[in-house]
Amino acid sequence: MMITLRKLPLAVAVAAGVMSAQALAVDFHGYARSGIGWTGSGGEQQCFKATGAQSKYRLGNECETYAELKLGQELWKEGDKSFYFDTNVAYSVNQEDDWESTSPAFREANIQGKNLIDWLPGSTLWAGKRFYQRHDVHMIDFYYWDISGPGAGLENVDLGFGKLSLAATRNSESGGSYTFSSDDTKKYAAKTANDVFDIRLAGLETNPGGVLELGVDYGRANPQDDYRLEDGASKDGWMWTGEHTQSIWGGFNKFVVQYATDAMTSWNSGHSQGTSIDNNGSMIRVLDHGAMDFNDDWGLMYVAMYQELDLDSKNGSTWYTVGVRPMYKWTPIMSTQLEIGYDNVKSQRTSENNNQYKITLAQQWQAGNSVWSRPAIRIFATYAKWDENWGYSNTSGLQTKDSSGSGAFTSSRGDDSEVTFGAQMEVWW
């Protein structure tokens, strides 16, 4: 009995140690940015984006506090088989006060099971809400291939010459479908589901240091029983993507070609809006972007893109953008960055153009000497000059020429310029 009692504290200590180790196994990842800024003409920091463009050059041009907080843990592992639970809660506020309340967005909650299928080694079976294999241009915060949402799939199936991924995800539109009530009046659904089915083949070796990824997405509206879509709704659509990635100069270059039709043209990224009656048409995008660390002194990010959205409603546009962000590294933790970006958006309906130049100079302290090193604290000054001749009508939402020159009746910003300055932190981990 004495021996047993003496062993008891040791057993308790071992058990506590095991429990502590399990608790420490929780993975904490995320992203956040926040800061303070001012506008030269007075007031808080303004941010600048060309009307009709889908993104903006972000250095010294972000006016919100935004964060994504991810918690995950491997819940079970036996040999090479495992289950991993992943979550993500995101929020955004306007950087106006100490206390700013907001409703957080539950962006991810999924289980990923690796090597569960013996005859498909290396594959991952997953289900739940997820950021699914997103492709983006960091310097303009632009996601050009993104079907994220609730879904399920099987990814990274090794075919020998490449890896195959299959997925189905969903996003919903407000209203969009209707039925008839007892008095023959239309009763609209609160939401109408849109389903996207995604097939990708990645890791196709094309040349030394170069790989190709090919994908096709089909999206369609899926109204509930006894509900129908409005006349003229696009109902469904396709998007095809080809992306070549080249390892070069301590970084990468990505060349992308995409083509989308009808319901897949609304977001131009892989989300479907099949209940819409104004998105029949097509989209073509040609994109080249990259990021490189040439040596201990210089780094670079860049983007060039052409996108043409041709809609039957004549509410499409032609958008092209080009920008560079060179980085000079004074020390391993201090650098200077200069971002120069230009956007031009031509209205399909009015044939008028909106354009904007934006230049930012930033002094930065970061955890390392790479263009990707974070955390970072930067002080910045931004100059933006724009000349806009069309906007979206405040009443109809259609593109219209801005005759007021001040955007009084449209979203046009007229012809003007502005200077902002401030400080910002950015971190991912």
Curated annotation (Swiss-Prot):
Which compartment or compartments is the protein found in?
Answer: Cell outer membrane
Location of site Greasy slide, important in sugar transport? Y31, Y66, W99, F252, W372, W428
Note the coiled coil stretches, chain numbering. none
Gene Ontology MF term list: maltodextrin transmembrane transporter activity; maltose transporting porin activity
Induction or repression: By maltose.
Q: List the disulfide bonds.
A: none
- Say where the protein is mainly found: membrane
Alphabetized InterPro entries for the sequence? G_neg_Bact_CarbUptk_Porin (IPR050286), Maltoporin (IPR023738), Porin_LamB (IPR003192), Porin_LamB_sf (IPR036998)
Q: Sorted alphabetically, which keywords does the UniProt record give?
A: Cell outer membrane, Ion transport, Membrane, Porin, Signal, Sugar transport, Transmembrane, Transmembrane beta strand, Transport
**Residues of the signal peptide:** 1-25
Q: What is the protein's membrane topology class? A: Multi-pass membrane protein
The answer to whether the entry has keyword S-adenosyl-L-methionine is no
Residue numbers marked as site, Important in sugar transport = Y143
Quote the biased-composition stretches of kind Polar residues, using this chain's numbering.
Answer: 397-412
Q: Which reaction does it catalyse?
A: beta-maltose(in) = beta-maltose(out)
Identify the SUPFAM superfamilies for this entry. Porins
Q: Where is this region: Disordered?
A: 397-416
> Superkingdom of the source?
Bacteria
- Record's GO cellular component terms: cell outer membrane; pore complex
PANTHER family associated with the record: CRYPTIC OUTER MEMBRANE PORIN BGLH-RELATED
Protein family per UniProt: Belongs to the porin LamB (TC 1.B.3) family.
Purpose of the protein: Involved in the transport of maltose and maltodextrins. Does not act as a receptor for phages.
Name it.
Maltoporin
User: What is the species listed in this Swiss-Prot or TrEMBL entry?
Assistant: Klebsiella pneumoniae
Gene name per UniProt: lamB
